[in-house]
Each structure stands twice: as C-alpha cells, then as structure tokens.
Amino acid sequence: MSLSIIFMGTPEFSVPTLRLLADAGHRIVAVYTQPPRPGGRRGLDLQKSPVHQAAELLGLPVFTPVNFKDAEERERFAAFKADVAVVVAYGLLLPEAVLNGTRDGCYNGHASLLPRWRGAAPIQRAIMAGDEKTGMMVMKMDKGLDTGPVALSREVEIGPNMTAGELHDRLMQVGAKAMAEAMVKLEMNDLPLTPQPQDGVLYAAKIDKAETRIDFGRDARDVHNHIRGLAPFPGAWFELEIGGKPERVKVLGSELAEGQGTAGQLLTDDLLVGCASGAVRLTRLQKAGGKPLAAADFLRGTPLGAGTRLS
C-alpha cells in the first residue's frame, strides 16, 4: 500500500523529504514549488528551485504557481484527489481551500520544538537565543502560523559551537525521516494529533539585514551566538579599515575564549576580540568578494595586531 501525496517545498532543506517519500513507494502525484527566480552572475538566467530540479530528476510533474488566489489553481490542486499534502519550507501561504484540498489535509515539517519558534527563521533564532536543543516536528496545518496539532516530534541537541548551517543540515535529514515515519503511521490510521501548549510561544521572525552587524558591546556569549546563528547565511559582519577604507568582513565561525578588554578591540594578534563581558575568538572570516578563510589564512592576507578596532 502507499499514499498519493502532493509534495510542496522549495529549498534544499525540502529535497531529502521528497526523495525519501518517493523511495518509500508513495505516489507523488504532483510537486509544488516556487517559480524559477533570476540567477547567475548577472541575474539574467532563470534558476529552478532545488525541489524543482529534484522532482524533474525523479520524473515527477512540477507546478509553480505564484500563489493560490486564482480559483482555477485551487481547483487544479483539489482535482488530484490526493490522500495528503506534505509541506516542507514551501514559502507560500496556503488558503483553506488548499489546506482542506486533500483527504487527510496538509502535514508540515517544521524546524523547531513548537510552540517555540513559530515562523520563518526557527533555526537561526534558536541558535541566536542560545538554545541547547531544538528539533523537527510534523504538524497538521491549520489556518494559523505554525499553530496546528503535532503528530510527531524529534529532538536535536545544539552544540556550543554549532552554526545555523550545520544545524540546518542535521535537521534536514532528521525531518525527512520523521515525515516518512509520519506517513507510514498515517497510512495505518495510527497518527494521533496533540494540540500545541498555550505556554512557551515564541516567534522566529525573518532575519533582517539591520540585525546582522556584530555588536561587540554585548556579552561574549551573546556575540558568539549571534555569529553562529547567522553563519553561513546571511553572515554576521563587522567593518574594518583596510587601506584607508572601511571594508565589511563576515564572520562565519567563532568560539568563546578567556580574555577581557575594550569591546570591539583585538586583544591579541590571533583575532581575540573584547566584548562587554569576556571575549570571542574569530575562527573563520570572509571579505567582500572573497572566499571564506580560516583565521590563520585570513591574517596572512590581512595582518591585524592587538589594539585594532572592529566596528
């Protein structure tokens, strides 16, 4: 036996779930993903999403509506008469006609332990807040923002130096297995739903460019969490005067270290930076237009000594 599934997703995070459901023998009757976007060096090429590309390799039909406001689009969705829709980082709002457009509704893979970190950036926000654990949850979608009842939960530890990129990759695999397990249980009519608690609700707002600059005037642990929560994308940054001009430098790795001194000033010649309390050592950096470099390699090209100001 197998389910007939409409899969809805867009980024690389969604791809392992699509592949695992297909490998499990479910009938993927349609794949919905966001439309191709301008890309390439000049932005002249239209680039298909990772899910779009994966679906084509699997020989699956792909649909790329801009939204579901058109009645014809909603009717096409319902016409598949699918058992269930699986949604993983699709990126479009789904109207009730779509949420109720399959026999068993829509099940979403969400990268947090709900109700903590509902919303667009749960991975980054969990690390930036210093959380020591997070997870993947399979929830049945309703018309609220990540408010539906939970079907399955898998907890994941967040290491003290783990970056958002590393956590993303871990949750991507955990989430795929969780969704595959949930679909087996759904097929067996053995997938009980548990309402989310009313307490502990936090919203994971989309990362704004204005919050990516590093404020060394904060506690060292907060600075470290800020850096790793934004690595590798969009990247936390500071400005450094190079050749008489301010240049933006991204920090893609850091660690807490012993030290105390002026906030935003290098305390040693190996990128130990003072904070309001304590210090952080910058371990991986990237200049504008350059490639990411380990601290030692960065310093070979841009020597910096104790007393240098980072702003």
UniProtKB/Swiss-Prot annotation:
EC main group: transferase
Catalytically driven reaction(s): L-methionyl-tRNA(fMet) + (6R)-10-formyltetrahydrofolate = N-formyl-L-methionyl-tRNA(fMet) + (6S)-5,6,7,8-tetrahydrofolate + H(+)
GO molecular function annotation: methionyl-tRNA formyltransferase activity
Binding site for (6S)-5,6,7,8-tetrahydrofolate: 112-115
GO cellular component: cytosol
Signal peptide limits: none
Cited InterPro entries: Fmt, Formyl_trans_C, Formyl_transf_N, Formyl_transf_N_sf, Formyl_transferase-like_C_sf, GART_AS, Met-tRNA-FMT_C, Met-tRNA-FMT_N
EC number, as in UniProt: 2.1.2.9
UniProt KW Membrane keyword: no
Keywords tagged on the record: Protein biosynthesis, Transferase
Role, per record: Attaches a formyl group to the free amino group of methionyl-tRNA(fMet). The formyl group appears to play a dual role in the initiator identity of N-formylmethionyl-tRNA by promoting its recognition by IF2 and preventing the misappropriation of this tRNA by the elongation apparatus.
Cross-referenced NCBIfam families: fmt
Family stated for the protein in its record: Belongs to the Fmt family.
Protein name (database record): Methionyl-tRNA formyltransferase
Organism: Rhizobium etli (strain ATCC 51251 / DSM 11541 / JCM 21823 / NBRC 15573 / CFN 42)
High-level lineage: Bacteria, Pseudomonadati, Pseudomonadota, Alphaproteobacteria, Hyphomicrobiales
Name of the gene encoding the protein in the UniProt record: fmt
